[in-house]
Amino acid sequence: MENRWQVMIVWQVDRMRIRTWNSLVKHHMYVSRRAKGWFYRHHYESRHPKVSSEVHIPLEDDSKLVIITYWGLHTGERDWHLGHGVSIEWRQKRYRTQVDPDLADQLIHLRYFDCFSESAIRNAILGHRVSPRCNYQAGHNKVGSLQYLALTALITPKKIKPPLPSVRKLVEDRWNNPQKTKGHRGSHTMNGH
């Protein structure tokens, strides 16, 4: 019998991002209790040698989101791709599919966190009381309408310390982004001074 390959998307991330993600998940599971029902599986509980951790996040209707972090993978093209990665799966019974970080954040947002959403505009106009803030800003991936922006400017969201774990933040590529210069003078080395 020949080998059967299964291809899956694994986002390359650095080791420190995975450590930060795991500590945020554990904090909100055990200390702040904002992540009720989440399940954390350690590397020694997994049968796969490359799995470093798993986070199971239950959603609606028997479905769940599973974020698996890996170690010991082949290194990437860049020096900082040291063989660490993340896969994001949506599971319902025996069906599994992979999702991107934005969709994962939206699914978490819809299920777990209070939101000052688009429906708040209509309720505020009608004079109903609305939830004044969104506790999970990572779940919003688009710019809202002008009314929504006006309401959010009027009522500023409260910052939660430590922040809630965001899948998009976990897999973002901060290495390939150009570095921002500070101040109005710009970078001295680039200006030739």
From Swiss-Prot:
A motif (BC-box-like motif) lies at residues 145-154. Keywords: AIDS, Host cell membrane, Host cytoplasm, Host membrane, Host-virus interaction, Membrane, Metal-binding, Phosphoprotein, RNA-binding, Ubl conjugation, Ubl conjugation pathway, Virion, Zinc. The modification Phosphothreonine is found at T97, T156, T189. One of its GO terms (molecular function) is metal ion binding. It holds the Pfam family Vif. InterPro entries: Vif. Residues 76-115 are annotated as: RNA-binding. Residues 152-181 are annotated as: SOCS box-like. GO terms for biological process: viral life cycle. One of its GO terms (cellular component) is host cell cytoplasm. The modification Phosphoserine is found at S145, S166. It is a peripheral membrane protein. Processed in virion by the viral protease. Highly phosphorylated on serine and threonine residues. Zn(2+) binds at H109, C115, C134, H140. Residues 173-193 are annotated as: Disordered. The record marks L151, T152 as: Cleavage in virion (by viral protease). Residues 40-44 are annotated as: Interaction with host APOBEC3G. Residues 172-173 are annotated as: Membrane association. Residues 14-17, 75-80 are annotated as: Interaction with host APOBEC3F. Counteracts the innate antiviral activity of host APOBEC3F and APOBEC3G by promoting their ubiquitination and degradation. Acts as a substrate recognition component of an E3 ubiquitin-protein ligase complex: mechanistically, Vif hijacks a host cullin-5-RING E3 ubiquitin-protein ligase complex (ECS complex) and the transcription coactivator CBFB/CBF-beta to form an active E3 ubiquitin-protein ligase complex that targets APOBEC3G and APOBEC3F for polyubiquitination, leading to their degradation by the proteasome. Vif-defective viruses show catastrophic failure in reverse transcription due to APOBEC-induced mutations that initiate a DNA base repair pathway and compromise the structural integrity of the ssDNA. In the absence of Vif, the virion is morphologically abnormal. HIV-1 lineages are divided in three main groups, M (for Major), O (for Outlier), and N (for New, or Non-M, Non-O). The vast majority of strains found worldwide belong to the group M. Group O seems to be endemic to and largely confined to Cameroon and neighboring countries in West Central Africa, where these viruses represent a small minority of HIV-1 strains. The group N is represented by a limited number of isolates from Cameroonian persons. The group M is further subdivided in 9 clades or subtypes (A to D, F to H, J and K). Homomultimer; in vitro and presumably in vivo. Interacts with viral RNA and Pr55Gag precursor; these interactions mediate Vif incorporation into the virion. Interacts with the viral reverse transcriptase. Forms cullin-5-RING E3 ubiquitin-protein ligase complex (ECS complex) by interacting with host CUL5, RBX2, elongin BC complex (ELOB and ELOC) and CBFB/CBF-beta. Within the ECS complex, Vif interacts directly with host CUL5, ELOC and APOBEC (APOBEC3F and APOBEC3G) substrates. Belongs to the primate lentivirus group Vif protein family. The BC-like-box motif mediates the interaction with elongin BC complex. This is Virion infectivity factor. It comes from Human immunodeficiency virus type 1 group M subtype F2 (isolate MP255) (HIV-1). The lineage of its organism: Viruses, Riboviria, Pararnavirae, Artverviricota, Revtraviricetes.
